[in-house]
Amino acid sequence: MSDSPSLSPPAPSQGPTTPRKGPPKFKQRQTRQFKSKPPKKGVKGFGDDIPGMEGLGTDITVICPWEAFSHLELHELAQFGII
């Protein structure tokens, strides 16, 4: 059996020469700042422009908080933590 080639272990595959890096690490911001200012309370366009209500002015106390932000969408209220 001298004619049979000798079995040798397969050559190790050549991997990357640089060490593997883990996933990128992101720095978390300390404070979260909104790009726009939070909405102000009050119904938009309510007050002196209603016929018969000229003497009342625009300082109207709103009892229901939904009325105070009726000019906004729900996602805008949620963005600023109102709901």
Curated annotation (Swiss-Prot):
Residues in coiled coil: none
Keywords (A to Z) from UniProt: cGMP, Hydrolase, Sensory transduction, Vision
Pfam families: PDE6_gamma (PF04868)
Alphabetized GO MF terms: 3',5'-cyclic-GMP phosphodiesterase activity; cGMP binding
Chain spans, region Disordered: 1-54
InterPro entries in alphabetical order: PDE6_gamma (IPR006952), PDE6_gamma_sf (IPR037030)
EC number: 3.1.4.35
Catalytic reactions on record: 3',5'-cyclic GMP + H2O = GMP + H(+)
GO BP, one annotated term: visual perception
Start-end of Basic residues biased regions: 22-43
Domain notes: The C-terminal region is important in conferring inhibition.
Subunit and interaction comment: Tetramer composed of two catalytic chains (alpha and beta), and two inhibitory chains (gamma).
Family the UniProt entry places it in: Belongs to the rod/cone cGMP-PDE gamma subunit family.
Function statement: Participates in processes of transmission and amplification of the visual signal. cGMP-PDEs are the effector molecules in G-protein-mediated phototransduction in vertebrate rods and cones.
Name assigned to this protein: Retinal cone rhodopsin-sensitive cGMP 3',5'-cyclic phosphodiesterase subunit gamma
